[in-house]
């Protein structure tokens, strides 16, 4: 995997100055009665741990003219050059404002594919006794999905000392050869195009036949909503924390519970903006592939478009319908015919794929709202309850993240389980959704009501 897979390359090129597609893992450490770690102590800790994470020793090298997919190369920068110190002791910052600032600025993966932001001196953080240390691991989506982010968080901050390299299917890094890659891609373009046609056509025909015969269900585009406006580079983040016990006890999973609440909140928001009776709301839910599925890309997730059924007033019926829709879409995206059709692009010439993508990004509208969309929002769900993260004597109070916004998506949701907490991070573009705080309050109420209906649990000791 010295040359990037097309799917990872798409994540790399989708990130732009006005749109970060990076992965963000935010960890809030509580030192209790002890002094919080200094920035130099955090650097020393990460330097010691990062040597056993080969994934953190690579970056990306692009070929001139994009005649070939980028290459994984070794990163010559020392670990300390990847850490950024942020003094948050001025009283103006919160965890939410800190995450909003970071999520609006993508990293340049051709220079450094990851950074660790260390926020020090943040006071009045719920659940933290003293000054909080907020560590945000920002990593290019081209080299990390949610599962990889969990492995990296455990390797860097997990309790106990690692003695072996973190077991990940790491890309093979080589020396940079941009001119060679470009020349080879240009010379081989006609041959690669010719060789790609038969397998691509065959795979696409099988997939489309399955869709036509009703064996696989592909949701048709539906009318867009207010929160489908194209976002600009500004970001706002709301962090909602709940006891894990509030989300358990009933038959619904945390993911289905979150989708049920999000559907109710989105429907309420639509009604407040003159769009009542929306029964077509959908969420994009990243679906992980099992380890047994042959997959050349670093990112082992595919998007599933899940109907939220807001027309069903009863939360139990709505959750059941959502669970069925989620299972149906997971079956769709993991079906061998869909996987074969997706993988068939691997043999297509890089220059043509990247050229089409570059043209699409250049001509795509940066403002306004599309007429129709496949999904209205994003809901990611990551289980990190198995982690026990520490930084010196400080213990992690929470571990969460931010889901990226993109074209036609101005509101996203990231659901994280860690310890005895479930954290829901709402990211929004304040330019296109100026009343994002109202939506966050709607979602909080919807979560309380949904958990009560599905799990028989009352609201208890919500920290934020």
Residue ranges and their predicted role:
Residues 1-6, 26-37, 47-51, 58-407, ...:
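Soluble acyl-CoA-dependent acyltransferase catalytic core bearing the H(X)4D motif
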Residues 413:
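Hydrophobic/aromatic beta-strand elements that line small-molecule binding cavities or substrate pockets
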Residues 1-18, 22-24:
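General N-terminal leader/first-domain-start detector
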Residues 437-441:
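A cross-kingdom marker of C-terminal helix-rich interaction/assembly modules
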């Amino acid at each position: 995997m010295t040359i990037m897979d097309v799917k990872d390359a798409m994540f790399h090129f989708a990130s732009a100055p006005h749109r970060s597609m990076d992965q963000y893992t935010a960890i809030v450490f509580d030192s209790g009665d002890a002094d919080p770690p200094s920035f130099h102590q955090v650097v020393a800790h990460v330097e010691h741990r990062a040597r056993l994470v080969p994934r953190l020793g690579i970056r990306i090298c692009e070929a001139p003219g994009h005649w070939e997919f980028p290459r994984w190369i070794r990163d010559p920068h020392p670990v300390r050059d990847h850490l950024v110190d942020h003094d948050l002791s001025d009283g103006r910052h919160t965890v939410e404002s800190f995450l909003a600032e970071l999520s609006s600025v993508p990293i340049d993966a051709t220079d450094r594919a990851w950074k660790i932001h260390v926020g020090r001196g943040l006071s009045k953080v719920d659940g933290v006794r003293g000054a909080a240390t907020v560590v945000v691991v920002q990593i290019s989506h081209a080299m990390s999905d949610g599962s990889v982010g969990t492995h990296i968080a455990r390797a860097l901050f997990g309790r106990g000392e690692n003695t072996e390299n973190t077991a990940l299917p790491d890309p093979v890094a080589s020396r940079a050869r941009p001119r060679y890659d470009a020349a080879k891609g240009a010379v081989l373009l006609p041959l690669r195009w010719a060789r790609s046609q038969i397998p691509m056509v065959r795979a696409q025909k099988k997939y489309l036949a399955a869709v036509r015969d009703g064996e696989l269900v592909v949701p048709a585009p539906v009318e867009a909503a207010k929160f489908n406006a194209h976002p600009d580079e500004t970001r706002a983040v709301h962090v909602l924390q709940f006891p894990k016990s509030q989300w358990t006890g009933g038959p619904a999973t945390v993911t289905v519970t979150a989708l049920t609440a999000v559907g109710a909140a989105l429907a309420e928001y639509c009604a407040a903006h003159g769009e009542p009776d929306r029964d077509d709301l959908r969420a994009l839910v990243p679906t992980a592939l099992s380890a047994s599925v042959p997959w050349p890309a670093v990112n082992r997730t595919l998007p599933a478009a899940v109907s939220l059924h807001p027309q069903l007033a009863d939360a139990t019926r709505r959750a059941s319908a959502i669970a069925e829709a989620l299972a149906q879409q997971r079956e769709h995206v993991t079906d061998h015919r869909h996987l074969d059709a997706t993988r068939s692009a691997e043999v297509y010439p890089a220059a043509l794929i990247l050229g089409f993508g570059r043209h699409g990004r250049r001509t795509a509208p940066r403002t306004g709202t599309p007429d129709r969309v496949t999904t209205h929002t994003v809901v990611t769900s990551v289980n990190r309850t198995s982690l026990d993260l520490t930084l010196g004597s400080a213990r992690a109070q929470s571990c969460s993240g931010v889901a990226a916004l993109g074209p036609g998506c101005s509101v996203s949701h990231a659901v994280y389980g860690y310890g005895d907490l479930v954290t829901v991070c709402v990211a929004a573009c304040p330019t296109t959704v100026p009343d994002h705080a109202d939506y966050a309050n709607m979602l909080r109420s919807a979560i309380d009501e949904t958990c009560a209906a599905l799990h028989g649990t009352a609201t208890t000791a919500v920290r934020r």
